[in-house]
Amino acid sequence: MDSKNPLPTPEKNIWSLLLKDFSQLQQNQFQKSQQPQQQNNTNINLNQNNIINNNNNNDNLNTINNNNTINNNNNNNNNNNNNNNNNNNNNNDNLNTINNIISNIINNNSNNVNLNNIINNNNNSNNINKNNNNNNNNVNLNNIINNNNVNLNNNSINYNNSNNENSINNINYNNENSINNNNNNNNNFINDIYNDVNNNNNNNGNNTYDQQVLMEQLQLLEQLQQQQHTIQQHLRGYQHQCQKQYEQRQQDYQQQYQQPYISPSSLLITSDDNQIDYNQLLSGNNINIINYLSENNQQPQTLPQSTPISPQLQTQSQVAPQQKQLLQQQQQQNVDPPPISQSPSYSSIASFSIGDQVNNNINNNNNNNSQFFPILPTNVDILQQSNLNKLPIDFINNNNINIEKLIMYNNNNNSILSNNTTPTLTPTVTPTLTPTVTPTLTPTVTPTLTSTPSNSTSISTTTTNSTLKPNSKTTTTNTKTITKLNKNETGNLDQTNLQNSKIVPIDLSLQIPIDSPSRKSLKKINQNIASRNYRQKKKDYIKEIEERMLALSIENDKLHKENESLKKIGGAEAMKLGPELMKLMVDGNKILLEMKKCLDINDERTLIYLLHQYHCVVEKRYLYMEKEVDKVANPYTQMRLAKVGYTPKQSLSGINIFQGPEADSWINLFKKEVNITLEQSNKLDSLRAQYCAVSEKIQFDLEKLDSEIKTFFFEKVFALQLGNDITDNNIEGIPASKVLPIEIFGPLDLNEQLDIINKLETLKNKLTLNCSLFLDTFSSISAILTPKQEAVLLTKVNIFACANSLDFELVKDVWSNIIQNSFSGPIDIGETLKKLFRNPTNQ
C-alpha cells in the first residue's frame, strides 16, 4: 500500500463515540447533582478504588495488553460481553468495567502496533510513517484516557446509588455498542492488513515471473527498433529513387528544351517534300510474289493435250532462278535491292502480252477438241447440248450411250439456273468480262471471247443494243420455253447465292454455224443472263443507298441532339468550372502551401517529393483543358461574348513572368534572391525569348479570329447599329461610324456555315496551343533550376491562383442575367453589371 493513502484508524471513531457518551453523562450528573447525597461511604470507596485503579493502570498495561491480545485473538466480543455482565451485577465495580474498556482500546492500539510491525516487515520503507503516526495516536489516546479518568473520578464522587445504577446501565449499553463497533472495525482493519501482507507475498512470489515478462518486453523493443531501422532504410531508398527519377526527368527536359520551340504549323509537310521512294520499300518478299504471279500467269492451264511453250516463257523460267540468287546475295550483304524497273523479271513481264498467249491457248484447245468432238443428233436442244459438253469426250465415244435417254434425264433434273447446281466451267470455257455498275446505272459492254472454225481468233463485243435486233424474232419455241423456265426459277433463287456467285453465260465456242437458229438462241440466253446480273447489281446498289440514307438520318438526329446540348452549354454552365477541375486546382494550392512550410524548415527531400506531386497535378490539367476550351469555342458562347464586347487581352489569367518590362524586373530580383548562376541565367533568357516569339504569334492569330467571328455574328446572326450613343463602348475591330446591314433571319448558306465552323475549330486549336505553351514553359524551368529554386519560383508565381469560387459565382450570375434576354445589347448588359456591383450583398 502507498504511503500517501494511510490505513483507516478506527480509534478516532471509537473515541468520538466515547466522548459523546461522557458528555451525556456529565449533563445527566449536573442535572442530578441537586439531589441529596446518599451512601457517602460507598461513593468514597468507589472513588478510592477508582483512584487506585487509575494509578495502577499504567503498571498493568503490559499484562493487560498481553491478556487482551490473546482474548482479542480468541473472540474478543464474547469476553467483553461476559465482563460487562459481571460488572453489571456488581455496582462496586463500575469503574473497573470502564477501565477494562479503556484497556481493551489500548490493547487494540497495541494490536495495531504489532500489526504495524508486521506491515513494516513486509513493506520496508512505506510503513515507517504509518508506525510513527500510530505511535503518536497511542500517546494521544493515553493522554485522553488519563484526562477522562480524572474527570470521571471527580464526577463520580457526586453520584448517588440510584444515579450510579442508571449511569452504569447507560455506560454498559454505550460501552457494548462502542466495543462492538471497535471490535468490528479492528477485525476489518486486521483483515485489510492480512490482505496487504498476502498481496506483498504474492508480489514477492511473482518477482521471477516479472523478470521473464521484462525480458520478453526487452526482446519486443529490440524487434521494434529493428523494424523501424528497416522502414527508415526503405524510406531512404525510396527517396533516393525519387531523386534519381527527378534528376533523369531534369536531364530529359534539358535535352528537350535545348532545341528551339516548334509550333504545330511548322510541322506541316508539303506534298512535294513528302515523296516516298517506292523502290526502297520493295523487299525480297514482294519480288518473290511478283515472280510467282508472273510464273502462274505465264504457265498455261492443264489441258487434255500439252501445248507448246512460247520462247518468252522459256527465257523467263531461265531468268527466275538467277534473280533469286541475286536477291539472296543482296540480303546477305545487306544491300538494298535494285529498282523494280531494272529487274529482268520486270522487263520480261512488261514485254509479255497476256492476250496473245490466251488467244494462242484457245486456238490450240479448239483445234484439238474439234478432232474428237461427238456428233450430236439434230433434234437435241442447244441447252441440252451444253450439258452434254460437260461429259468427258472419251466417256461419250467409248461408251455407247443412248443420247436420247441422257437428254430425258437432264430434263427431269434441275436446270443450270437452279439453286442445287452451281455454274461450272468446261475445259474449253474462255475468260469473260462481266458487266460493272456505273454511277449512272447504265449497262456496260459485255465482251465475250468467241472462237470461229478458222485458226484466227478475235474478241467480239456485244452490247445491250444488239439485243434489239430483228433477228431475235427468229428464235425457236424451245428457246422461248427455256427462257420462261429460267425466269420462274430465278424468282425462287436465294439472294445470298446471287450475291456470292454470278451466273456465267453459256459458251458459244461450239461447232455450230453462225447463221443457225440455235446459235442465235444461245446469244439470247447470254443477253438474258447479263441483264439478270445487271438487275441484281442494281438491287444491291439500291439497298446500299438505302442503308447510307438510314445512317445519315441517324447522324442527323445525333447532330440535332448535340446542337440542343450546345445551347445549354452556352448558358450559365459555360462559366462554371467542373468539380474535377476545381478539385485539381485545390490540390495544387495545397501542394504549394506544403512547399512553403518545407522552405521555412529547409527540408530538401520533402521538397523533391512535393515537386514530383506538383508535376503530376499539372499533367492532369492537360486532360481537363480541352473540355474548358470546348465551352469557349461553342458558337452560342461566342455569340453572347460578341454581345458583351469581350476581347481577349491576355494569354492566360495570372502573373506573366515571361513578357514585358515588369517581367524583366521581376526576373532580375528573383535571380538575386535564389543565387542564379550565369549558365542558368542564360538558359532562362533563351527560354523566355522562345516563349515570347511563339506567344506573340498565337496572340495575333487569336485577335484576328475573334474579330472575324464577331463580325460574322453581327452581320449574319443579329442586327445591331452602332451610333453616337455608345461610342465609348466600341467593339474592337468595328468602327463606331459603321452601320452594319440588317438582314432578314433565315438559314445560312452552306459555305457560310462551313466557314464559321472552320473558324471556331481554329479558335479551339489556338486556345489549346496557348494554354499548353504556358504549362510546358513552366515545366521546362525544372530542368534549369534546382529543386529549392524551383519551389521558390512556384510559390511566388502560383498558376493555380485563379481557383477563387466567389469570383466564378459572380461571373456566373452576370452571365445568367445576360442570357435571360437573348436580344439584349451592350447597354443593357452594362446596366446589369452596374446593378450587380452596386449591390454586392444581393449576390
Swiss-Prot record:
Region described as Leucine-zipper: spans on this chain: 522-529
UniProt keyword annotations, A-Z: DNA-binding, Nucleus, Transcription, Transcription regulation
SUPFAM superfamilies: Leucine zipper domain
SMART domains given in the database record: BRLZ
Subcellular localization: Nucleus
Biased composition (Polar residues): 298-315
Residues covered by region (Basic motif): 519-520
GO molecular function (one): sequence-specific DNA binding
Swiss-Prot/TrEMBL GO biological process terms: regulation of gene expression
bZIP domain segment(s): 517-580
PROSITE patterns, alphabetized: BZIP
Disordered, as annotated region: 27-92, 298-347, 430-478
Family assignment from sequence similarity: Belongs to the bZIP family.
Name of the protein in its database record: Probable basic-leucine zipper transcription factor S
Organism: Dictyostelium discoideum (Social amoeba)
